[in-house]
Structure formats: structure tokens, C-alpha cells
Amino acid sequence: MANKTILFNKHLESNAKMVDFHGWDMPLNYGSQIEEHNAVRQDAGMFDVSHMTVVDVIGNDACAFLRKLLANDVAKLKVPGKALYGGMLDENAGVIDDLITYYLTDTNYRVVVNSATREKDLAWIAKQSQGFDVTVTERPELAMIAVQGPNAKAKAAAVLSAEQNAAIEGMKPFFGKQAGSLFIATTGYTGEAGYEIIVPENEAEAMWQALLDQGVKPCGLGARDTLRLEAGMNLYGLDMDETINPLAANMGWTIAWEPSDRDFIGRKALETLRDAGTDKLVGLVMEEKGVLRHDMPVFFTDSAGVEHQGVITSGTFSPTLGYSIAMARVPNSIGDTAEVEMRKKRVAVRVVAPNFVRNGKQAF
């Protein structure tokens, strides 16, 4: 029996096509994935992300514990509400999950982890917390709605109270703030401005309906995937997992090497990998017909004339650009052109940074 979010009936009311997503009944689309995608790029769309897992880490050792648990360094967070993206690694530097951590106080942090990795993550966090003065509490009574797009903030403002709007006025990107019963964050998975709103389950349906009434378009997993891929954002399980280190997943920027005496889990293995050199994650663009897909092989010849092979981790048709884009893991000697094998023939592709669309515009 699949899990259902508190918004399940609201999805059915909007004629959602429901699919199983890692044990959750979730909307794939509400009729047109392309229309949903374009709504987020041009206006405002919303996603039920209540299947995500909210975990509060509280206690005298909260900071010290998270500095060991995560490859990024929560000690960088000095302003209440500031958020940090990064990886939680195992001892071999494989990525257990990627997650966002919010700094609330020196003894209180909020962590949001993926739904597909929930049980594994919670078990790992509990195991690693032994010996630290911390309490790790999952918050299943909280739902989450992401409102994204150039008009998302204005439309969300119409459903928030005057006090809530005052609390979040001028909030910079990658911050979160408790505003009444809501935790409102300027984060997202689309490359657009907007909010991710953590809302008590008993208020979630009313908030969803209020956003619908403001003309915010409900969007499913299909649009969520094309939007995040255009934005060059990783999907756990495709672009990285426990067999992949963050340097090979375009996550090098999330690793806090300094201070050098911070012994985060996986550090020694990661230093060895860094010094030896790893594969890297790049973007691919194919302007001729066809769609780049997960697991297609990528070939290129280096400056010495040696052929190398990599693989597409995520690929799709980009509605914003009008052609296919992909992310691929390849040896780091790649230049700015390559070939992808499709239907038993090789097709030329351009190699770009894995970031295709930002704020509705081409980003490469």
C-alpha cells in the first residue's frame, strides 16, 4: 500500500495522473507536463513535496554533530535562518544523500532530506549521533508545498497573513523563517525564485486551495524533473548515489575542506579521490532531433587522440530551450564536443557546464 500525502485528495480533485514514487502515491502531471513546466518558467506553479522528510536536530552538540555528519560546514552559518546545501557521505565518500540544513540557533538546526532515502538517512543519522548531546526528531506531521516561478512570491503573498508577509519581507535566497505556523524558505528545485513552505498537515489543504484560487498551477513530478534538469540540479539515485563521490557529481563546491582539522565522515577517502583525480559531471546539449536519456553512452577523443567513454545520468527534452539536454559523468579530460550513441549511431553533442536555464533564460 503506497503512502499518501495529506494533499492526495486535492490532487484527485485536479485530475492528477498518480504514480508510485519510491512508495508514495504522487502526481505525475495534471494533464500537461509541458504546460506545468512553462507555468513555473513564466508565471507560478506549485508542487506537493510533503513526501520529503523534515528532521530537527536539537541539543548542545548540534553544531559539532552536523560538522561531522556533513561534508559542508554548518559553522559557516551565522545568521538565523541561513541554509546550506551539501552531501552526507559514508566512510568511502559515497553520497548517502544530498540535503538542505537550516541554521536556527547554535543548538537548533532543521534538515530536509529526500523521500527515497528516508529510512536509510534516519538510520544513518541516528547511528552517527551516538556520543553527541543531540536529539534527532523526524517531523511527519509537517507537509510541504513548493511555490515556484517569477510570480510565485507575489501570488504566495496573497495567501499569507500580514504578519507572515512582514516576517519574510526582503528575505534573501537560501533562507528559512518560522512565520506563525509556517516555516517559509527561499529555496527550490527549479532554478526560479519562490518559496518552499513547510505547513502543519491540518492547514495544508486550505493553503493548497488558497494558492489554486490565486491562479498558481499545480505541477507534478514530470515537470519537476524537467525543471530541475534545466537548472542543472542533481536527482539522487540518478546523478549520484552511494557509489559516486561528490567530486564526480558536480558537488565539489559543497565540500568545506577548511578548516583542515574538521574530520567529517568520508573526508580521508575524499582527499584520496581528489588527489588521484575523478570523473566529472558535465552538461550536454543536442540541437538536432531526438532525446538524450539516462544510461546512453558518451564518447569523446582527448587531445592525445585517445577515445574515452562516459554515461548520461539524466536526460530530457528541454521545453524552455526547445531541444534535448542531459547531464553526463565523463572522464575529466573531455573538451567541448562529444558524441552520444542513440539507436546504434553516434550523434554530436556540445559539452557545457551543467546549468542550462536560470530565471527562464538560457544559462550557457
Curated annotation (Swiss-Prot):
Alphabetical keyword list: Aminotransferase, Transferase
Q: Which organism is it from?
A: Shewanella baltica (strain OS155 / ATCC BAA-1091)
Name the chemical reaction catalysed here.
Answer: N(6)-[(R)-S(8)-aminomethyldihydrolipoyl]-L-lysyl-[protein] + (6S)-5,6,7,8-tetrahydrofolate = N(6)-[(R)-dihydrolipoyl]-L-lysyl-[protein] + (6R)-5,10-methylene-5,6,7,8-tetrahydrofolate + NH4(+)
- EC number, as in UniProt: 2.1.2.10
Q: What is this protein called?
A: Aminomethyltransferase
Q: Name one GO molecular function term.
A: aminomethyltransferase activity
At the top of the EC hierarchy, this enzyme's class is transferase
What does the annotation say about its assembly with partners? The glycine cleavage system is composed of four proteins: P, T, L and H.
Provide the function of this protein: The glycine cleavage system catalyzes the degradation of glycine.
GO CC, sorted alphabetically, is: cytosol; glycine cleavage complex
Q: One biological-process term from Gene Ontology?
A: glycine decarboxylation via glycine cleavage system
Q: Which family does it belong to?
A: Belongs to the GcvT family.
Membrane spanning segments where?
none
